[in-house]
Design a protein with these regions (language model features):
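N-terminal secretory/targeting leader peptides
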Residues: 2, 16, 34-121, 137-332
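Bacterial N-terminal signal peptides that target proteins for export
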Residues: 2-19
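Cleavable N-terminal signal peptides
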Residues: 20-21, 31
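Intrinsically disordered/low-complexity terminal segments and short unstructured peptides
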Residues: 21-23, 304
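Sec/Tat signal peptide C-region and signal peptidase I cleavage site
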Residues: 26-33
Length: 332
């Protein structure tokens, strides 16, 4: 058989063309390999105040993160009930969640310390407080990325009047962060998911609840609320938590992009919280919610009790880490 010899230049040219064509075909695949899609859940009903900052974060990530990171936002408690989201996050059913330490306290009780902090969150980042907490959280499969709510205090809301810091005889809805404080005030404590509080108030299952200065109008609770106790106590902790393995699996550019988005949401939410809290407190008065104010001595003791109760619970649950967290999170 006769062999046909091609000029070397033609062979080289054909090989180069083949390589170029292959590279062109692989470009979209390479781009896809660098983009990750994350599944996200929200502990709060879509569109409500405590959901909206996270929803803005999701939108910004999806708008600016094409080719790097995208988020598939599957919704709020209707998708996965609030109290089941911590387990879903830890197991990898979802990759990130807008939630609170209160809802993962069974996994990482030390995380509740963020509510008792008296240092600004920016300082807690700088002084190693967040890194210290994240070491504990990562041991339980979680990673704390960013706060989506700050500069907002909690209050006790009631449908029965009191004239001193004594809740004896009252049934109060709690989250884990309030349990010891409210118990020391004499309350009978009841724990329910936020979506069940309106019905509990309506049926007399509870006489009041602990909640931040913002948010009761979204949930309709103002209809069943007559009083708010001042002063406020603790500081709202609401943030974005990751599944630790998923966070570790991201590429450096992906993590850098998400951290940039996290810094944006922390800055915007912290600024908005100050004005939004003032607006909501004013609105509460306008719809007839009366303010209960204690005298100076009672107010001082009330706040001291709140801090002592909170930190005592942390140190009891975590004798090794509680004192160090208090040192890092509490102002001198």
């Amino acid at each position: 058989m006769e062999h046909i010899r091609l000029p070397l230049s033609r062979v080289a040219g054909s090989a180069a063309a083949l390589l170029a064509a292959t590279a062109t075909l692989l470009l979209p695949l390479a781009a896809q390999a660098q983009e990750v899609t994350l599944r996200a859940i929200n502990s709060f009903q879509e569109g409500t105040y405590f959901a909206r900052q996270f929803e803005a974060f999701v939108k910004k990530v999806n708008d600016e993160g094409k080719g790097i990171v995208q988020i598939n936002y599957i919704g709020g408690p209707k998708a996965i009930p609030t109290m089941e989201q911590g387990a879903a996050l830890r197991s990898g059913v979802v990759d990130l969640a807008n939630t609170t330490a209160a809802y993962i306290a069974n996994l990482v009780p030390e995380a509740l310390a963020l509510n008792y902090a008296t240092r600004p969150f920016s300082e807690i980042r700088k002084n190693g407080g967040l890194d210290y907490l994240n070491k504990l959280m990562q041991e339980k499969g979680l990673y704390y990325l960013a706060k989506t709510g700050d500069n907002i205090q909690y209050h006790i809301y009631l449908n029965k009047k009191v004239d001193k810091p004594d809740l004896s005889g009252l049934k109060i809805r709690i989250a884990p962060i309030f349990r010891d404080f409210f118990t020391q005030l004499g309350a009978t404590v009841v724990q329910t998911a936020p979506g069940e509080v309106y019905t509990a108030l309506d049926r007399g299952v509870v006489d009041g609840y602990g909640w931040p200065a913002i948010g009761i109008f979204d949930l309709g609770w103002h209809e069943k609320t007559k009083y708010r106790i001042d002063p406020g106590f603790y500081t709202l902790e609401l943030g974005i938590q990751f599944n630790a393995k998923k966070w570790a699996s991201l590429t450096p550019p992906q993590r850098a992009f998400i951290e940039k988005m996290a810094a944006w949401v922390e800055e915007t939410s912290a600024a908005a919280s100050i004005t939004d809290a003032a607006t909501d407190l004013k609105k509460q008065g306008e719809v007839g919610i009366e303010t209960i104010k204690f005298n100076d001595a009672q107010a001082a003791q009330y706040l001291k009790t709140s801090q002592d109760a909170g930190w005592a619970a942390i140190e009891k649950a975590s004798p090794t880490h509680g004192p160090k967290l208090r040192e890092l999170l509490s102002a001198k």
